[in-house]
Structures are given as C-alpha cells and as structure tokens.
Amino acid sequence: LVEYYRLAYIRKPEFMGNTREEERDPAYRVVKDLPWDEATIRTRMGQFAQLYDQVGNCAAQVPEDRQTAYYHLIQYPVQAAAKMNEKALTAQLARHGLADWADADAAYDAIEALTDRYNQGKWKGMMNMAPRRLPVFQKYPHVQADAPLPAAPAIIAKWNAVDGKGRLTPCEGLGYEGGAAMLTPGESVSFNFSSDAAEAVVSVRMVPTHPVSSPQLRFTLSVDGSDPVELAYETYDRSEEWKENVLNNQAVRNQVVPLTGSGKHTVVITALD
C-alpha cells in the first residue's frame, strides 16, 4: 500500500483526465493530455500494472471469511486506481498514435467489472464508479492530439531532500519518492553535482502549504557560493498556481543559475520562513 499511496500522491486517480470541475469555462471539463513525456507515462503504467498483480496475488493468502473485507478495503481501491491510470494514460498515448484505443476502453470495462464485484459484497450497491458522471470517469473520446507530447527533460542531477547535507527532519510519506524533509528557518541543505555546462536550471519542489507564522514562504538558493537568490512560493486560495499545486501535489520554483568553471558544483538552499 505504500507504493499505492506514493503513486496517488503524484497524481490522484480522479485527476488523471486533466479536467477541473470548479471552472466556468466548459473547456476544463474536456479530457486532455497531462504534461508528461512518453517515458514518464510508460513508467507509471508499469508501476501500476505491477501493483495490480501484487494485490491480486495477495488475495490468495487471505482466509475465505475475510475475502470480502480484503477486496473492499485493499484490492478494489488499488486495482481500480491501476485501471483508472491505465485508461487515462493509454488514451493519452493513443491520441498520439502510440497505443491502441481498444486497450484504453478495456481498462474502462475492467473498472466496471471491479465495481460490479464490489457491489455484490458486504457493502452491496454502495460504490459508484463514476461520481456525478464526470468526464474523467467515462470512456474517453477517440480523438487525435493537436500537439506532440513534451520531450523528456535533460536532468543533470536529481535528489530527494533527505539526500542532502544539513539539519533536516525527514517527513515520511511525503514527496514524489517519499524522500521529503523539513528545514526550519535559518537552516540550510546542500547538494553536490558535476557539470561542464555554462548554466543550469535548478528546480526546487516543495510540499504545497500555506504561511503560518509569517505572510510568506521563502527560501534562498545559491550555487558555488554565489549571492543567494530569494524565492517565495506561498499561494492564495483558488489562485491558478494554488490549483496547479493541488493537482500536482507540488509547489515548484525554477531558477536559472550560472555555473562557474567546470566539474563539481554545490547547491545550497536555506529556509527563511
């Protein structure tokens, strides 16, 4: 279940259609591509396929008198989420001619079958596979994309917060890879990397939250001892950035930094709030 929650942390099943329901513009209710490259999509599909099989195999070890409880509390949530991801991501690939629409439709049919089984058990008739009949839960229209998938980013180095050097407090279960950590105001964390490039983009990913003891959420970023650049990432309720943070479960700040010389470099992040 840890992996199930980790994948849902990155993107909840109900957000996989890249739709919104609070907007007045009906365009937000049209299923569309997520801003993911093909490799990211296929990796996530593989991770969910593995989860689907694992939770099904575990069912064989559950006593008969607990089969229904296991299915309702564990197997259905995991397998339905897996098929929801398979449906949405296969459809995205199909819009680009990279997958078969029949496979996306088959994933929808699988959710239907899983839900039918759920509704024959202890909590008979309780589960609705398409709350409010929202577009994200339906079979997706067979349409062609009007723009290509984004290219995979060129990553020089990648870390979780817990990989850094500093006075960090690990936050179990938070972060895309479960490696988030907290910095108290005034504390710093550093990371080392190697590159011969003249500049780089440092992308800092935070758990989206709101200010508590001050009006802002700020940190500074410095590379190779350069003057620190101050960045803030607080948002306001229902702002566009707030909405994106909720959907992605991340607050992101990108900063272009010059790299002096070649070889090894050090990034230092210091919390201000």
What positions do the PLM features span?
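Substrate-binding groove of N-acetylhexosamine-processing glycoside hydrolases
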Residues: 1-164, 197-201
